[in-house]
């Protein structure tokens, strides 16, 4: 494996980037951030330099161990395989499948439908309504699932990849003014997780590229 700090290409508000920041913090991995502003200058993800890292023109991208990995779940799977302690995935195969199911529900079934590229397509005047619709649809399903899987967190009482995906998506829901009162399980788990240091240090309000007016 290559020596030197991993480098994370991240945007402070990107929920996918936040997932990876949480995972890196959880595993105690020291890393450097290279901010990629998805809005400034038409989007820095479209530069030729960044496209050599990720032809999909998306964040996050992680340089680690001599390779570059994109897609947040793939990054977390790699971290789990190479640095397994503390765990993001339970040892029990059934619990592990449930964690992956919840993670994929959020990462494939909710977030992509309300990401920046989709919102641009629906038009400025329709963005809030569209985001609320798709997040609500996903949360209706997620709440039912979590009612049967949750302990203190999404799957039992240990933080997992599912939790790493949940918190950034709840932040998206809040940003789009989704009514969270129908989702008490989601809301309770989110509150418990936000009390943990790894979720705080990785928070969008505490990143190098966070605008001054949004910092806490």
Curated annotation (Swiss-Prot):
> What cofactor does this protein call for?
glutathione
Q: Where N-acetylmethionine occurs, residue numbers? A: 1
Task: Supply the Gene3D superfamilies for this chain.
Answer: 1.20.1050.10, Glutaredoxin
At what positions is Phosphoserine found? 137, 181
| List of residues binding glutathione | 14-19, 45, 59, 71-72, 111, 115-117
Work out whether the entry's keyword set contains Zinc-finger: no
Q: What is its EC number?
A: 5.2.1.2, 2.5.1.18
Q: Which CDD domains match?
A: GST_C_Zeta, GST_N_Zeta
Residues carrying N6-succinyllysine: 57, 177
Provide the positions where the record notes the PTM Phosphothreonine. Answer: 136
Gene Ontology CC terms, in alphabetical order: mitochondrion
Q: What does this protein do?
A: Probable bifunctional enzyme showing minimal glutathione-conjugating activity with ethacrynic acid and 7-chloro-4-nitrobenz-2-oxa-1, 3-diazole and maleylacetoacetate isomerase activity. Also has low glutathione peroxidase activity with t-butyl and cumene hydroperoxides. Is able to catalyze the glutathione dependent oxygenation of dichloroacetic acid to glyoxylic acid.
Self-association state and partner proteins as the record states: Homodimer.
Name of this protein: Maleylacetoacetate isomerase
